[in-house]
Amino acid sequence: MPLPGGLWWLLCCRRGFTLLHRDYGDGELSGDGDEDEDDETFELRSPSPAGGGRGSLDVTLTQPTRNGPITDRLQSWEETWSLIPDKGLPEDDPDVIVKGWLYREPRGGGARPWLLPRRAWFVLTRDSLDQFSSSGKGARRLGSLVLTSLCSVTGPERRPKETGLWSVTVSGRKHSIRLCSPRQAEAERWGVALREVIASKAPLETPTQLLLRDIQESGGDPEAVALIYRRNPILRHTSSALYAPLLPLPYEVSAPGPGYAPLREEAVRLFLALQALEGARRPGPLMQGVLQTCRDLPALQDELFLQLAKQTSGPAGPPGLPATQDPAALRYWQLLTCMSCTFRPGGAVRGHLLGHLERTEQALPDSELAEYARFIRKALGRTRGRELVPSLAEISALSRRQELLCTVHCPGAGACPVSIDSHTTAGEVARELVGRLGLARSRNAFALYEQRGAQERALAGGTLVADVLTSLTSEEVGLEDSPDSGWRLCLRLHGPLHPEGLSPEGHELPFLFEQAHALLLRGRPPPPDDTLRALAALRLQSLHRDFSPRGPLPLLDRLMPPPAPPREQPSRPARRPPPSAALLAGALWSPGLAKRRAERARRIGTGRSTESTAQVGGGGGGSTTAAVLGGWKRLRGMGQAEAMAAYLALAAQCPGFGAARYDVLELSTEPGGGAPQKLCLGLGAKAMSLSRPGESEPIHSVSYGHVAACQLIGPHTLALRVGDSQLLLQSPQVEEIMELVNAYLANPSPERPCSSSGPPSQDLSDTSPPSQHQVLEKPQGQSGCLRQLQD
């Protein structure tokens, strides 16, 4: 008959205590449980209370007595506590930091409604957290938790559905203790004290860290390094499971994130995932999952670097590496390549990894593994951290040590393919395209933009293009059925437009011409009607040369932006001025300018809404077509380059040309200034403005000449210094805003009112007579022509 499981466990523990008797006393502990154990004593050395001498403190190891025929052998937990010496009264211990009565959860985990928490006397010292049955002398010890630098504390938190008490959880290597108190202040006091004790502990080092130090110290001796690898299997490739992490990770009970286990358990799971790579039919998704885990749990990044260094060392250590012809043997190197292009290892791990790569290159200089080692070393020197893990396409390219192909659309030049890697920035791509198009000496600045339908966003110069491609690809997969799911990268004008001195033979003139047209079609606010008709005539002249009655009539929707639908403005109560009103009032931020713009926009909007109504009715749409065609006829003889230059000069005078809008939060600079206010920041060619969401008219505006400085003061906070005052704005796009504002500040332009006429387009002054708005509602015999345009 087999022995019960509990009895086997008891015998093993008893044998273990017998073998380790030297750690607990000087006497010989017998394994038979005779009466000699009841008289066993040993001496603890402690400072003498009198002077600096050392006295002795006798501690007796007592065994509980039992009556009846049952065995006198101790239960496991009783024998464990019998080997822990009693320190005497907690009040007499000078190392006590905090003590008091607290509730503790019963054994077996969380509290249950039918089992109430029990009170215990807790004592916190600089080495452990002990609990006793009472606060008096000779109290029985109920438990103890040794505190190290890896212990963690969570809370205080309240659990109304369980105990209704405030709890603080202390996690150790084997178990955790949850301290409960009905008062939040007391729970916070214990939490702070526990964290201070843990923070004061010296960092623990794992055996792997000690071996890494030995390898670093003997790095110049290959034989010594090889000997360390041969004697320590923890550093070599293995097909067995890993039961503990290689680096010291904190003990935790709660998961660090949704869907994850505690860190130490996740480290073991990562090693299992690495071993699964050898037989995976599609290793790409598995690699991406491992990278995403390290992205969500940064504490595991160095752990994974060490695990990969272990698995790429070969079963016998360097230079005994696995066969390079086996595809499964290369997958560890491929994942290490992806890791080196995504994360930056820590100091000690980085040094060990670089040494491991160097030894691999020296052992097999002409092998494929040496090529991977050289690629990884270069990547480690350039990697600065990624916002997103590589996509499947990037993982496939990195596994072959190849570059990615990125397509950038350039107005007037088509699609330009650009080769990038995991470290290429948007600024580098923009500079390469500017050099290709011959725009290096241009006065205009250009940048890379992310465009999706009618929405576009400037990319900061330091943005990694690989991260942008990954985010756009993932969003496109999630929006397959959306009409705006199409996206692309484009090179665009970034900052003020300088149309002067453009060469008719270069690429810059058609590049800016096509871009200006695309910007005007999405302009906010749209230019006046007379300017739109003049621009449409100039575009027709540049595309089709002189007007011909036999040619097809152009479509207005490709020449002019669609009219905005009429919107009624409901009556609103008077608002309290925003915090920026007092800051930016007077000469810097002019409310009078906003009023004039609002009145002008009201007149323009009324005229355009009337025209839109007339076009819907079918009576007055021909007036716009007739005006555009009339202006086109008067441009007979103008060359293509001349028409493009006139188009750019006229477009540059429009206040809404190239304007960018950003959603920002305005922060008050005064203490107690109130909650942040949601506003829209508009950056135009001549000035910047602040407006409320949903409104096209600004509440305040200021020219760039009054902006003294623009700088970052936080991760998402931008400071604009206007005169002697400061404006604080928060936005996730602060880097783009700062680059655009600094581009405008570096290229000041004289303030001038917007006009539909200018030196390059003086012959267009008759294309839109002043009485045009009065005759829009009257049919002018062009309904057939308009019908032909719509067809």
UniProtKB/Swiss-Prot annotation:
The keyword Phosphoprotein applies. Residues 95-199 form the PH domain. Residues 29-71, 549-580, 593-623, 748-791 are annotated as: Disordered. It comes from Rattus norvegicus (Rat). PANTHER family: AGAP003327-PA (PTHR46049), PLECKSTRIN HOMOLOGY DOMAIN-CONTAINING FAMILY H MEMBER 3 (PTHR46049:SF5). Residues 549-559 have a biased composition (Low complexity). InterPro entries: Actin_motor_Myosin, Band_41_domain, FERM/acyl-CoA-bd_prot_sf, FERM_2, FERM_central, FERM_domain, MyTH4_dom, MyTH4_dom_sf. It comes from the Eukaryota. GO terms for cellular component: cytoskeleton. Residues 404-755 form the FERM domain. Residues 237-399 form the MyTH4 domain. This is Pleckstrin homology domain-containing family H member 3. The modification Phosphoserine is found at residue 30. Residues 594-605 have a biased composition (Basic residues). Coiled coil: none annotated. Residues 29-41 have a biased composition (Acidic residues). One of its GO terms (biological process) is signal transduction. Residues 1-18 form the signal peptide. The modification Omega-N-methylarginine is found at residue 636.
